[in-house]
Amino acid sequence: MSDSAVQRSSGRGRFITFEGGEGTGKSTQIKKLADRLKAARMRTLVTREPGGSPGAEIMRHLVLSGMGKLLGPEAETLLFAAARDDHVHTVIEPALKQGIWVLCDRFADSTRAYQGSLGSVSPGLINAMQRVTIGDLKPDLTIILDLPVEIGLQRAAARRGSGTPDRFEGEQLSFHQGLREAYRKIAADEPARCVLIDANSDPDTVAGRVWSALRDRLLPTPASVVSV
């Protein structure tokens, strides 16, 4: 399908989330996809978690600085939930109702992977918080970028330069290996929503894979449109 076919989409916006471990290239791929959608004259909003709204950005600082970790895994998860609640109700939902396509760097799957699988927070608590913070909101498509842990951490270090690793970049190698497996399990458990994409290639090649996933899942080719 050509990019012009994207313009036929109307009504409520689409919600696309990007997930993956550290250094997998989420921000790069979100920008490339946003540029392509905007070139097709689609209204597009790029946002992130934790953060994305003034209130949520305060929580982002608390979490990534490591202050949340001092409170214990459950309390840290509550900080993420508070940030998500503000983000969903002040940014994401209003944009979707206006027909805007929302591209989000991390969402609820990050809580399942980081705090659920690796942070010893019970699935029951996570599910309860999700019912309160996001209700019935669910991504139309989740792109999970997959990359060998060592390569991802090297990329993250190069991006950071001389800066201090954040709360999660500074975790042990075993943490990041477990994180990769947690994301792979999410992709395997929810194939209708999630697409696992090999991110161990140059950015343009990965961007092509992301576009193919979006086109196939959200932009089915009408009989009257000739694929190119």
Swiss-Prot record:
CDD domains: TMPK
Name the UniProt record assigns to this protein: Thymidylate kinase
Gene: tmk
Family, as annotated: Belongs to the thymidylate kinase family.
Highest taxon of the lineage: Bacteria
MF (Gene Ontology): ATP binding; dTMP kinase activity
UniProt keyword annotation of Secreted present: no
Upper lineage: Bacteria, Pseudomonadati, Pseudomonadota, Alphaproteobacteria, Hyphomicrobiales
PROSITE patterns listed in its UniProt record: THYMIDYLATE_KINASE
The species this protein was found in: Bradyrhizobium diazoefficiens (strain JCM 10833 / BCRC 13528 / IAM 13628 / NBRC 14792 / USDA 110)
